[in-house]
UniProtKB/Swiss-Prot annotation:
Belongs to the UPF0178 family. This is UPF0178 protein A1S_2615. InterPro entries: UPF0178. Residues 120-155 are annotated as: Disordered. It holds the Pfam family DUF188.
Amino acid sequence: MLPFKLWVDADALPKILREVILRASDRYQLEVIFVANQNVGITPSVRIKSLQVLSGADQADQEIVNRMSENDIVITQDIPLAAQVIEKGGIAIHPRGEVYTTANVKARLHLRDFMDTLRGAGVQTGGPPPISERDKREFSSALDQTILKQKRKTA
């Protein structure tokens, strides 16, 4: 197995992306841990694990941050979690394929705070559209590129 792990913030992960993650685990012999506050319906194996945490805001996020190591990869759409992952030396990937960086995560945090302010004022902001086949391909490509980059870095 590789010297780094793939952590999945599974509470909000679109189900369409699970197969991409499981295929990557097989292809690269990569350990994957799905973390959620509910059963995610993943069959455990040698490389695939599921970790159920207590219900509550940010419980899964905190568990990931506490358990992850430098160079680990985390899949999340949670901006504060992505910021913590980067701060701890990991790599965070959005389910639509964007790899978070120190610069873009700060911009995303500001935008998130602004949208929270709008929602607090009663403005309906709507949510993101469902994951498309194009998003799935972009996520798969970003995940493969990130795994290969980490393989070279940790070799």
